[in-house]
């Protein structure tokens, strides 16, 4: 599960500065969802190989009233869902009543809290932070978010348990890779040259073929996620949701259909049947992002009556960036007249044309029309994302792509694609080796991706294609002349001098 780090503190202590520093290596995902805290931001960050989600909860000073109190409550809800809380204070401004009010709340949450004193550059940090020890939150960690001083060591300490888990998972993955079939590059190139590629065994069984398919139902508030969840589980199924101890994660509900096991990840909380018609759905962006990271397939639910919004595109962008398979679900399709339906389809083609590989279903979660076909697309997307393809098959497909459309010329020389092999799955990752691949235009890269998708019949899953430049065996070597060549060179130079 992707860890979540929440930045908490009163206004103007440097939370946004630290947020921007943590997310600078990745494009920050900014989501302004109605009903959530104003100016609340969510971003992806990376520490080594560990990816985590950063939440800027907005300023809290403990004295909010009215609508400000409601916004503060939403920020405190984000704290409850976080794995690590960085409580930021201003070392230059000193301890304030707002700091004490926030600290009192954090002590009650029993969360893993790190007290972070920002803006310690240019002052005596030890003296400035001494008064913050009275907050009873343990050690005070000094940083300068604007310059990055102390940030790395703070993250390594705060995320240490998750880093250890990542190392253990990487070791297991390396052990699995060692068991996989290795191939001899030179032998493969000889087979390519001779046209002797055996593509009969083009796929292999995945090591988790018997595991349940995890799919997450994601989308904006009030698009019918919980209604769809209960419809897929069965209306008579009574599910207790958000029990104590489960608020940090989405609700995982196992189910089985046609002898296929599934795990439904509901980001809105699975309701009892009698509560399906509540007008206000419980919604959390953090739950959605974590569910996307943990799922195999994501069902993005769109309201047909509101068409596509920027929030839908933000969630879809996170799904694709995470490499997850996607199925588009247009809900509330019943009751629309034919002209409105045509307008909705045209809008989908216009704004979502870049994911033409995803299945689109027009359903009514309330009445159940079209819901049963979702399972077919879920299985199709999952199988596309996890199916393994042999090196011989991928290389042959690459050759056919070159035969249909040759790579362009670069500096008078043709870009040469030598061979391709699988570099991973879920999503499928294809590694292509060759010469001058760094100069290959993006248009030809997209052509190769589409050719692989069509040839392998991959639906619902993105494809990652990586290009690795083959090493030049003569790079850095200086040609040496033989004795006869040296003598000939001297004769030519001597003859040229006489002229």
Swiss-Prot record:
SUPFAM superfamilies: P-loop containing nucleoside triphosphate hydrolases. Residues 387-471 form the KH-like domain. GO terms for molecular function: GTP binding; ribosome binding. PROSITE patterns: G_ENGA. It holds the Pfam family MMR_HSR1. GTPase that plays an essential role in the late steps of ribosome biogenesis. This is GTPase Der. The lineage of its organism: Bacteria, Pseudomonadati, Pseudomonadota, Gammaproteobacteria, Aeromonadales.
